[in-house]
């Protein structure tokens, strides 16, 4: 994120309901918002996302077109009152997220920022080593002009993805009647079978959503009065937002990287490359000496080692 000119911040976890009332998302998200009252009976939410908060900050701090463009990001715990929390960190009420928000004077700038963040996310997921797809998606309660999701392909995924090997990919939730096709041949009783259509051969796979990027346009800036002085008038800003589910990345990595013995994390996100266990080194100087020789050799060859030298059986 830093390489793409983004500025790291840390925004408040506790958000006043009044900010959400400005965008009417307090009504849209409803029971998903985890709220409470303070001692003065004022309503607050534990932040599920931070569009309102960052817009409020920027309407106080950004005064001129000279302050633009800006993209802020944070890595922070989020809260959503999920109706059915399940699958450990895959879908919980509390999760870690990397979220970013961009602010531009013109729509062209916002679109370029969207493409830059898309490229940035591709680099991140490529470096991790995921087998993933980028698909068109419903923007949901966050809203905006358009959005795309990043899905790690896994049979345990909750989303169904439809794509070909060229230029078409979508979350199945977004498909309309134009993509329906008559099927004359018999197929196996499995909703994940490949099908032929006017778009070519379509593959249908399950995916775990690990990232989502949005062209917000002026949805939040207009509702909350975020603008700057430009050419002797007040110009409403164009926004984008971009999220990565940090907690979910761990679950997705496990789904794609395991064997009969357990988890095999990709090297770039593993805590260490190997474990070195010294057995009974307290009773044997030879074992102790050899273990330390092996440890030194591995460290000197840039191998990240977990050296377990506990006095335990």
Q: What does each model-identified segment do?
A:
Residues 2-313:
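NTP/phosphate- and nucleic-acid-binding module
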């Amino acid at each position: 994120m830093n390489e793409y000119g983004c500025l790291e911040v840390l925004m408040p976890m506790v958000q006043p309901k009044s900010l959400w009332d400005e965008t009417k998302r307090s009504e849209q998200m409803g029971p998903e918002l985890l709220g409470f009252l303070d001692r003065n009976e004022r309503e607050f939410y534990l932040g599920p996302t931070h569009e309102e908060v960052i817009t409020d900050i920027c309407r106080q701090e950004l005064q001129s077109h000279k302050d633009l463009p800006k993209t802020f990001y944070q890595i922070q715990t989020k809260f959503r009152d999920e109706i059915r929390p399940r699958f450990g960190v895959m879908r919980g009420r509390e999760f870690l997220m990397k979220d970013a928000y961009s602010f531009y004077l013109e729509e062209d700038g916002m679109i370029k920022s969207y493409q830059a963040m898309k490229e940035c996310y591709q680099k991140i997921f490529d470096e991790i080593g995921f087998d993933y797809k980028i698909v068109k998606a419903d923007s949901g309660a966050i809203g905006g002009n358009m959005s795309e999701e990043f899905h790690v392909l896994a049979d345990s995924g909750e989303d169904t993805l439809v794509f070909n090997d060229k230029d078409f990919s979508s979350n199945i939730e977004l498909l309309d009647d134009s993509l329906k096709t008559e099927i004359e041949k018999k197929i196996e009783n499995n909703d994940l079978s490949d099908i032929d259509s006017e778009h070519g051969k379509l593959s249908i796979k399950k995916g775990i959503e690990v990232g989502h990027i949005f062209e917000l346009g002026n949805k939040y800036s207009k509702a909350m009065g975020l603008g700057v002085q430009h050419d002797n008038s007040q110009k409403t800003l164009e926004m984008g937002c971009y999220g990565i589910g940090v907690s979910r990345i761990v679950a997705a990595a496990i789904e794609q990287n395991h064997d009969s013995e357990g988890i095999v994390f990709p090297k770039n996100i593993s805590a260490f490359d190997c474990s070195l266990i010294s057995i009974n080194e307290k009773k044997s100087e030879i074992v102790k000496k050899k273990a330390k020789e092996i440890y030194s050799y591995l460290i000197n060859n840039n191998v990240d080692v977990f050296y377990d030298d506990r006095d335990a059986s």
